[in-house]
Amino acid sequence: MSFIQKQDKEIYEVIQNEFNRQNNNIELIASENFVSEAVMEAQGSVLTNKYAEGYPNRRYYGGCEYVDVSETLAIDRAKKLFGAEHVNVQPHSGSQANMAVYLVALEHGDTVLGMNLSHGGHLTHGAPVNFSGQFYNFVEYGVDQENEQIDYDEVLKVAKEHKPKLIVAGASAYSRTIDFKRFKEIADEVGAKLMVDMAHIAGLVAVGLHPNPVEYADFVTTTTHKTLRGPRGGMILCKEEYKKQIDKTIFPGIQSGPLEHVIAAKAVAFGEALQDDFKVYQQQVIQNAKTLANTLTDEGFRVVSGGTDNHLVAVDVKGSVGITGKVAEETLDAIGITCNKNTIPFDQEKPFVTSGIRLGTPAATTRGFDETAFEEVAKIISLVLKDPENEKALAEGKERVNTLTSKHPLYN
C-alpha cells in the first residue's frame, strides 16, 4: 500500500476506509467472502500486465509461457475439485459464464425454464430486465407456497407444458439442498439440456457437503468467489462434447483478453480448496447458518422454509416484526452488520423494498466466527429489528458488534 499512499492519496483513503469497514463490521451478505492474502497477492501481481488472447499453448500473443502454466494449473485444480471433464476459467463473471452457455445451447427466442427471481432465482435466469429475459423466452418454476421449497412436481408440469430447450437449476437466495438428479430426470423426460448455476454453493459442492451437479448437468456455471472463497470471477464446467463450443464462445465470442492475474488468483484459491481444512471451514459455514436460523426462530422471526441446509438464511422481517427488508438492511448497517434486503417467495413488496433480508455465514466464518458467535449475532439482530428506532438498543447492538469484531480481526 505504500506506493498507492505516495502516489494517490484519494484512492489510498478509499482502500483504507473500505478495509476498516470490512474489519469493523460483521459481513452477512451471502455472496461475499474474504479471500486469503495469497489470493490477493496473486491478483495484484505482474500478471496483470500480460495480454493472452486464446488458450494455453494456443495464444495470439507471444510471451505467454508463464501465464499458460498458471491458467493450466487453475483448470487442472478445478477439474480435480469438481470431477469435471472440461473447465474454462476465463469468464470474467458468473453472468458471462451463463451467457456463454446460453449462446451454446440456445437460439434467440428459444424457451428456457428457470427459477422465479422472487423465489430465489437470479437475474440471469430469465429476469425481464436482464439479457437472458430479453433474448430468450423464459418460463418460471418456483417454490411450494406451504413449505417454501422447490416443487419438483411443478417443475415437471411446467416443463411438460412449455417443452423448454434448456432447464436452469440453481439460485441466489435458496437455503435448501437442490436435487440435481431430479432436475436431470425432468430434463430427460422433456428432451431438454440441463444447466446448473452453482455460484452460491460451489464451495460446499467442492468438499462434498452438497450434491455435485457435474454428474448430472450438461453445463455447470459458477462464480469463483462466494463460498469458493476465490477472486471475483466466473467459470464453466461441462462435458467434453461441449468443450470446443464453450471455449470458442468465451473467446473470441464474448471476451477478448483473459484476466491472467485473476486466473492465477483462481488457481491459488482452488489450491486452497483442495486442502483438508477447507472442508472443516465449509462444515463450520453450515453449522453457523443453522445456528443463525435456529436462534432467529427462537427470537420470534420467521425463517423462510423453516431453516437452512447451506450457507444462507432468508428471513421474513415484515411478517415477523412489521418492517420492510429495506428498513432492516439500513438498521443493521447502522450498527455494523451488513446484509441485503431480499424478496421472499410470494412477496408483495417491490424489489427495492422487499419483505425479507438475506443473510449468509461464509465471510464471518472465514474470520473465525463459530456457533457461539452466531448465536450472539442473531440476538443482536433481534434486539435492533424489534425496535429499530430505539437509540438505546442501537447503541447496545453496535457495542456488541464491536466486541465480536475485535475478537476476530479480518487480517492479522
Swiss-Prot record:
Q: Which UniProt keywords apply?
A: Amino-acid biosynthesis, Cytoplasm, One-carbon metabolism, Pyridoxal phosphate, Transferase
Mind telling me which residues the site (Plays an important role in substrate specificity) is annotated on?
225
Pfam families linked: SHMT
Q: Which residues bind (6S)-5,6,7,8-tetrahydrofolate?
A: 117, 121-123
Asked if the Swiss-Prot or TrEMBL record annotates the protein with the keyword Disulfide bond, the reply is: no
Q: In its keyword annotation, does this UniProt entry include Transferase? A: yes
Q: What is its EC number?
A: 2.1.2.1
Which N-terminal stretch is annotated as signal sequence? none
Q: What does this protein do?
A: Catalyzes the reversible interconversion of serine and glycine with tetrahydrofolate (THF) serving as the one-carbon carrier. This reaction serves as the major source of one-carbon groups required for the biosynthesis of purines, thymidylate, methionine, and other important biomolecules. Also exhibits THF-independent aldolase activity toward beta-hydroxyamino acids, producing glycine and aldehydes, via a retro-aldol mechanism.
Report the sequence similarity comment from the record.
Answer: Belongs to the SHMT family.
Q: What is this protein called?
A: Serine hydroxymethyltransferase
